[in-house]
From Swiss-Prot:
Facilitates the functional incorporation of the urease nickel metallocenter. This process requires GTP hydrolysis, probably effectuated by UreG. GO terms for biological process: urea catabolic process. Coiled coil: none annotated. PANTHER family: UREASE ACCESSORY PROTEIN G. It is found in: Cytoplasm. Keywords: Chaperone, Cytoplasm, GTP-binding, Nickel insertion, Nucleotide-binding. Belongs to the SIMIBI class G3E GTPase family. UreG subfamily. It holds the Pfam family cobW. It comes from the Bacteria. This is Urease accessory protein UreG. GTP binds at G12, P13, V14, G15, A16, G17, K18, T19. One of its GO terms (cellular component) is cytoplasm. The lineage of its organism: Bacteria, Pseudomonadati, Pseudomonadota, Alphaproteobacteria, Rhodobacterales. It comes from Cereibacter sphaeroides (strain ATCC 17025 / ATH 2.4.3).
Amino acid sequence: MSHGPLRVGIGGPVGAGKTTLTEKLCAALAHRCSMAVITNDIYTREDAEALMRAQVLPAERIRGVETGGCPHTAIREDASINLAAVADLRRAFPDLDLILIESGGDNLAATFSPELADLTLYVIDTAAGQDIPRKRGPGLARSDLLVVNKTDLAPHVGVDLRLLEEDTKTARGRRPYVMAQLRRGAGVAEIVAFLEREGGLQLLPQE
């Protein structure tokens, strides 16, 4: 893209699976494009360190940002700390095709500044309850792609998966969503295809 690498924001509540999604996308894409990751944590760099431990990307391609206070501010109202990390990565790796920007855990109102992210993925957790899609919120309703994670847990937490998907369709309108089990890799291929289709991400053929 003319302004540099595709920048993809990954948001969602604490524990929904944002870091798992980031890890799975790195595993699927690192050998097919030049990519990097920025993680946002309030007071630590735990998510960045978790990705380094998983060895899905070289450590120098991962930046951990400590947002302090409200993590929502660092991706929306004042994204300067994240924009500085983007600029730093672009200087270090001029050939970058993709930067994933993982937000700190936040509520259903979290959204990314258009200045920071070209596309937004929003992750929700099936185990959080049957009524999550009905609560809407900008992240859930208006993100470019909604990822309904941990669908395998539905029978264990009293969630009717068919009804959950119906409510998700209603909340999303024409916007796409994926029913996923990210730890098992289910749904990752659909998310990659979305990034290619909607983000214009150019990938090398799979080996």
